[in-house]
Amino acid sequence: MRIETLDFSKFHVGTDAERYEFSTALLTGFANAGFIKLINHGFSQEEISQLFEENRRFFDLTDSIKAQIANEDGPKPQRGWSAVGAEKTGLLNTGGKTNLTKPDIEAPQDAKEHFDIGPSEDTEFPNKWPDNELIPGFQPWLESFYERSRYISFALMEALEIAMHLPKGAFIQKCQGHASELRLNHYPKITVKTLQGGKTSRIWPHTDFGVITLLAQDDVGGLEIQDKDNPTNFLPVSREDVSELVVNIGDTLERWTNGFLKAGLHQVTTPREIVNQSTETVRPRRSIAFFLKAHRQMSVGPLPQFVAEKTPAKYEDITALAYQQRRTAIVY
């Protein structure tokens, strides 16, 4: 299995033929691997580098300062800072199965902290920001990155509509509103021995809740995706270019397509080059993820186009917010 690298400019400014070629390649890449890489998407190398600098500036704040905008545990969209170990992703997809209730097992630990925001206009679940005097320019920079990421995500959904011969807006109209989220991740340095112990991982195998995810990652390594040709195996996904984005399918798109497209199971663990060196320390890792989400009151049950007598609905008809609440309740 391989991850295809697609040139977004072919869709954004290409001819009709190039747009269709990109669309079909996107669908094929998603169907084969659940993931693709995206280049020429509009973010320059300098802008992605600045994004990682904003990540560093935030997580360099003291825990006491970050705690002033801490996320409140519970079944709701996350906002603000979550400390190392607050989230328990090891409970989300035990045995590769997507859990909708918390399994009755001891939760393994996550060795990461993160900061989450939603849209600036969201009054139902408002954002929590550090004081601008402590980290000048942080909020407007992330708000701008959020909006541009949403634009790219909508364009990718338009491409899928084209490739799957769906009515215009079949996916995009369900994603309007105040639901998508942006997350900064920081994985502090950790020993290989700790990660090999089986009780702690940087992030455990899981699928994302939303429609699709755009991920920018640094060069530390450790991101791995499930090999669909050999589901017990995970394949490393290294960064080949500063500005590339890794794009994966989330639970919602799997549900909308009635399982035709499968959410991409992934994890962050010990980089392959030091996996057998138990005395080594894994460097801190940083990543930034944009999660395209459905409107909170939209159904995440299968679309009618994917349900037939021979392919009955595999997923229940519940709202996007109810689905997120079920999944979020598992990790806290």
Swiss-Prot record:
Residues annotated as binding 2-oxoglutarate: R285
Enzyme's top EC category: oxidoreductase
Pathway it works in: Mycotoxin biosynthesis
Domain of life, source organism: Eukaryota
GO-annotated molecular function: dioxygenase activity; metal ion binding
GO biological process terms on file: small molecule biosynthetic process
Annotated effect of mutating T98I: Impairs the catalytic activity and abolishes 4S-methyl-L-proline and subsequent pneumocandin A0 production
Essential cofactor(s): Fe(2+)
Domain Fe2OG dioxygenase: 178-294
Keyword terms of this UniProt record: Dioxygenase, Iron, Metal-binding, Oxidoreductase
Gene3D superfamilies (alphabetical): B-lactam Antibiotic, Isopenicillin N Synthase, Chain
Family: Belongs to the iron/ascorbate-dependent oxidoreductase family.
Protein's job: 2-oxoglutarate-dependent dioxygenase; part of the gene cluster that mediates the biosynthesis of pneumocandins, lipohexapeptides of the echinocandin family that prevent fungal cell wall formation by non-competitive inhibition of beta-1,3-glucan synthase. The 10,12-dimethylmyristoyl side chain is synthesized by the reducing polyketide synthase gloL/GLPKS4. The thioesterase gloN/GLHYD exclusively interacts with gloL/GLPKS4 to maintain turnover of the polyketide side chain.
Name assigned to this protein: 2-oxoglutarate-dependent dioxygenase gloC
Source lineage: Eukaryota, Fungi, Dikarya, Ascomycota, Pezizomycotina
Name of the encoding gene: gloC
